[in-house]
Amino acid sequence: MTRKSQEAMQAAARLAERKSSPSVEPEHLLMELVQQTEGIVPRILDKLNVPQAQFLAELRTKIDKFPQVTGGGQKMFASPRLEKIFQAAETEAQEWGDSYISTEHFFMAMLKGGDSELNGLFKKNKVTAEAARTALTEIRGKQKVTDDDPENKYEVLNKYARDLTALAAEGKLDPVVGRDEEIRRVVQVLSRRTKNNPVLIGEPGVGKTAIAEGLALRIIKQDVPDNLIGKKLMSLDMGALIAGAKYRGEFEDRLKAVIKEVTSSDGQIILFIDELHTLVGAGKTEGAMDAGQLLKPALARGELRCIGATTLDEYRKYIEKDAALERRFQTVMVEEPSVEDAITILRGLKEKYEVHHGIRITDAALVSAVKLSHRYITNRFLPDKAIDLIDEAASKLGIETRSVPEEVDKIERELMQLRIEKEALKKEKDESARERLAVIDKEITELNAKNQLLREQWEFEKGGIEGIKKLKADIEDLKVAVAKAEREGDLGKAAELKYGKLPEAEKKLKALEERSKEGAKSSSENRMLKEEVGPEDVAEVVAKWTGIPVSKMLESESQKLLHMEDSLKHRVVGQDHALTIVADAIRRARAEISDPNRPIGTFMFLGPTGVGKTETVKALAEFLFDDEQAVVRIDMSEYMEKHAVSRLIGAPPGYVGYEEGGQLTESVRRRPYSVVLLDEVEKAHPDVFNILLQVLDDGRLTDGQGRTVDFKNTVLIMTSNVGSQSILDPGMSENQKREAVNEALRERFRPEFLNRIDEIVMFKSLGEAQISGIVKVQLDLVAQRLRAKKIGIDFNQEAIDFLAKKGYDPIYGARPLKRVIQTELLNPLSKEIISGKVKAGDTIHVKANGSTLTF
């Protein structure tokens, strides 16, 4: 007996004992057979459309009528009726050619046994031996019972695979647009005599699984060669196959059963294995074979037609290593679609997403999703990244439609506060409380009326959107029903749906959409819900993903960009020429007219120490990101040795730290829109510049792990002191200084490096007038720090001139000024504050008095 038969017998004995029956009757056994999880009898009844709950209820009634024996303790034994069924089951097993007596043999024996009690029950539920035999043949196929666990080998594909053709017939698969060449190639390989196993190879997100789904859709539409019409495409679920295989050999058993079912279908079933590389090594334990080895013989003989899908990296890593497995598959390369093709693919999918989110998606949104994702999301592939953008933008609007609008929410919160206040004031007895109560009542009445109006408008708009969503879903269902009726040859039904219900529903939808558009036009000012996804919604999602501002510029931002130099001048004094060059680069990028294949700007800032080179970079970061720390700052003095280059892009394979990635590449991967500062660039080893050539020219760099990092949205600034002696020489004219600096640069850097820089910016040495401006900037910072302590401070002109004169040093620039402010102003001031002479609320007046400052 099989395991399930033994379990059923034991359960039947326990049931008889519970019911105090004198012996185990066939009804007890039948009851357990019908209730058996993963058993075969429930599957037979399913196929015969027998309502199991009703069947069990009738059985229970029969069992309850059996005579009962009290006193207990007696041993349970099989009744003569059951023994007769045992013998019949043995005969049944021999007839089927099985080595074990299985549960279905008992069931067939009961049907054929001529037991009057059971016959009545079967007749009432229209269960006949012939029908049961047909159902059983369907379930078992050509399998024989050769071990004690046959149930795991019946209908294994239903357990461990998804029927893609069935899903396609029900309209549950997304339409597949384009990709005709690849599908034709797959069909070509499938039609070979041997080794008819295509494997789809491509980058993640280019649509490999979609090609398999496209083939399923074509099989259903009969848009395939004759040898594929009516075939089933099943997607194997490796996870389900491995999960729960507790004993050694159980996984192999399951896989053998899958292979057997596919091969015995005589080519009717094509297997699709997504993530094909999971086959190699799957289920491998010591002494066991892995899945790949079990599949090889069937694949080579052409008995098992299989479509695989995997990425380039995994194919190389797992499948190419096993040459015997590799030669059984024929590769079909799936390239990333072009921008135009991706737009076509999105247009094909648009309807599915509109139905799901209940929102219209404009064509402009589809185009901008593809173009923006192609330009700004460089580490992923089309069409997947563009589909994700559209999906998220539509999801955002869909959520807004379904949740209470902000205006309504705000009013309801106000109402809540007023009601709480009203309850508190009711307890007060004085006049002012009564007056306030009257005011609150009036406010509550007004807000209630306003809320009522807004809620009605929201419900009305929401109702319109929901109505359109429901109609679209209905139309989708009707189209599936039409296709099904046409396939089944029910032309009457197809005509009724196609020329009756479908046009009617489409007409309704058109009318609803027209009304909705009219309403949107007439009340565009007061409209609460937005019901279509536009390009600006997509741009907003891109900005959230990448941090790159691609959304439409607001008035305030365009004004800010036009006057960018003025904001930078508040921090950087005396270097107007340098600020204009940087501002122009940022404006070009934001207007989207700069070269999309290069960084926003690459500059080299030259000049003596302390003239504001690094300060300009910080000011730029604060202007762009409101945070001066948003600079990817790399001190090139740390890269003096040749081997330090690997710290920038990450260690090569085989070295410690390979997994970590490089300092420069990782920070730009995380923040693609940033200011990169390479400080003191002349201190680095010359080999470092070889790496920078790629960044300066193509805006890209490949890190130690072979990933391409995109620098197209960065501003790259290098600072250097090369030629600062010439800049400081008072006897040289501007042109002579520039000549001397260029000469020094040519000596220090290679021509191919200098030639790739957008602009070499010379910072002038600072004069006394500029130092005076810097004093004001620094004193503003001091005042800011004191304001936090509630202390005011002001300076007269003499004090400013005194600090400027004392802090001026043409060689060291503005840095000595900070030290002077520290010693002359901050040190004595700190003593005054600590001693308690200066307290919160005071204002300090600072004046110059000869050689010191007085407070």
Swiss-Prot record:
ATP 1 binds at G202, E203, P204, G205, V206, G207, K208, T209. One of its GO terms (cellular component) is cytoplasm. PROSITE patterns: CLP_R (PS51903), CLPAB_1 (PS00870), CLPAB_2 (PS00871). Residues 337-547 are annotated as: Linker. Residues 766-855 are annotated as: C-terminal. Residues 155-336 are annotated as: NBD1. Residues 387-521 form a coiled coil. Keywords: ATP-binding, Chaperone, Coiled coil, Cytoplasm, Nucleotide-binding, Repeat, Stress response. Residues 1-66 are annotated as: Repeat 1. Residues 557-765 are annotated as: NBD2. Its main location: cytoplasm. Residues 78-142 are annotated as: Repeat 2. The Clp repeat (R) domain probably functions as a substrate-discriminating domain, recruiting aggregated proteins to the ClpB hexamer and/or stabilizing bound proteins. The NBD2 domain is responsible for oligomerization, whereas the NBD1 domain stabilizes the hexamer probably in an ATP-dependent manner. The movement of the coiled-coil domain is essential for ClpB ability to rescue proteins from an aggregated state, probably by pulling apart large aggregated proteins, which are bound between the coiled-coils motifs of adjacent ClpB subunits in the functional hexamer. PANTHER family: ATP-DEPENDENT CLP PROTEASE, HEAT SHOCK PROTEIN 104. This is Chaperone protein ClpB. The lineage of its organism: Bacteria, Pseudomonadati, Bdellovibrionota, Bdellovibrionia, Bdellovibrionales.
